[in-house]
Amino acid sequence: MSLNQFHLSSDQADAYDTAAQLLKSAGVDLDNDLLVPPKDSKKSVMALVGKAGSGKTLLLAKLYEALSQAGVDIILGDYEGKRRRDKRSLAILAPTNKAASVLRMRGVPATTIHRILYTPVYDPEYEKIAEWLAGSSDKPTVEGLTEEALRRAYDFFQAYKSMAGALAAAGLRGSDFITGWKRREEPLDIAFLDEASMLDDRQFEDLQQIFSTLILFGDPAQLAPVNQSGAMVFDGIK
């Protein structure tokens, strides 16, 4: 995959290559769009740091585009269908919804850490819509929803990759289609975490338990969380 189309600076291109090398060692070859099934035993963490304006968010967005093009499944915080264990997957995270919204405005389907640690339980009737939007089933017929409502849901999901937003566009409330939340038990594959300067040790440990490959994007000039004694979680990562 050529970097020329990305319009990255030399520093960004170096960081891209570093991340691509880590991903290749984890079985995701971005140069050749080749994917190897994940290995449960292999764990890796990387930190890509730079001050505000250095282009971390653009770099994250381009890495997301490359993984998506290679065929990696994208994990959405507001819906997760059945996954094959041999499929590679990526979750893009931020500590707060505000930070996740910045990425979503760039077309990057980001979610919050909380939405990954806890997964929603869908009402079976409305889960049919989610499965259809996610591409795993045919278009359903749902009592009380018109074809126009389903079209709005489809258009919204294609534009923003938000399942909750798509169902809201169809005229549903969260309390209609989400019946509860449960703590995640099964592991995930790859994660990109933006605004890693806001991450505390407990969140970092939780994410390392869930993900086999974790890439942090952070600003060393920001203030650390109040319970971190001035230290960033990525300070000790090489």
Which residue ranges define each predicted feature?
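Conserved ATP-binding/catalytic motifs of P-loop helicase motor domains
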Residues: 1-238
